[in-house]
């Protein structure tokens, strides 16, 4: 009996989990997302409130999209962005775990944590002092703060891409990239 236990123990220790290769479609989509994000950052036009300060919404009153809305839009899903804006313009993608928005996220080539990081870039706590009119230099400084956060996020996204792609591949349902079909509600939260 002792020998059987030792044999089972050695067999279990010798078992190597099979390495997961990143899904090729996710690799392509991730490269597209990083390209779109670089163009968005270079353009330097971010959602703002009525005073011109950066605002964390999917789309502002002038139709300017947040970084994640831009990625969804540029990837061929403007109807998904419109649905999110209509349902909850302040939606946090990290809270969405089902439905067409979730399907898009799973198939984007980005991990859940990366999506949360990108969307959180414009989350700036201005505090009570920012309830009054702000001079142009303060507005410019806050916009540059958003640009700096975007540049930092891009550097993080380029680092360890293989690990990120492997993580994104592991959450694919049945190793298949979901097809995004916009239904209502587009945002399904648990």
Mark where each language-model region is:
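Second-shell loop/turn segments in exported
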Residues: 20-26, 53-61, 68, 89-92, ...
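Stable alpha-helical elements in mature extracytoplasmic
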Residues: 29, 33, 64-67, 97, ...
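A recognition module on extended beta-rich or small alphabeta surfaces enriched in W/G with H and D/E
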Residues: 96-126, 132
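Sec-dependent N-terminal signal peptides
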Residues: 3-11
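Glycine-rich short-loop/terminal segments
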Residues: 18-44
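A cross-kingdom marker for long, charged
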Residues: 103-110, 116-118, 138-190
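Bacterial signal peptide processing site
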Residues: 14-15
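Short N-proximal segments of mature Sec-exported proteins
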Residues: 34-82, 86-87
């Amino acid at each position: 009996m002792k020998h059987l236990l030792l044999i089972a123990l050695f067999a279990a220790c010798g078992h190597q989990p099979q390495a997961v290769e990143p899904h090729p479609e996710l690799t392509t989509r991730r490269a597209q997302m990083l390209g779109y994000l670089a163009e968005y950052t270079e353009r330097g036009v971010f959602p703002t409130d009525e005073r011109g300060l950066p605002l964390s919404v999917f789309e502002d009153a002038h139709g300017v999209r947040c970084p994640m809305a831009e990625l969804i839009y540029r990837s061929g899903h403007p109807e998904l962005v419109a649905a999110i804006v209509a349902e909850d313009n302040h939606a946090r993608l990290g809270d969405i775990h089902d439905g067409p928005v979730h399907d898009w996220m799973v198939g984007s080539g980005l991990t859940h944590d990366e999506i949360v990081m990108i969307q959180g870039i414009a989350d700036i706590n201005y505090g009570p002092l920012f309830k009054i009119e702000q001079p142009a230099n303060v507005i410019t400084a806050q916009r540059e703060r958003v640009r700096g956060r975007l540049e930092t996020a891009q550097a993080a996204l380029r680092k360890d891409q293989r690990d990120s792609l492997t993580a994104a591949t592991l959450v694919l349902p049945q190793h298949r990239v979901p097809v995004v079909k916009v239904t209502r509600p587009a945002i399904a939260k648990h």
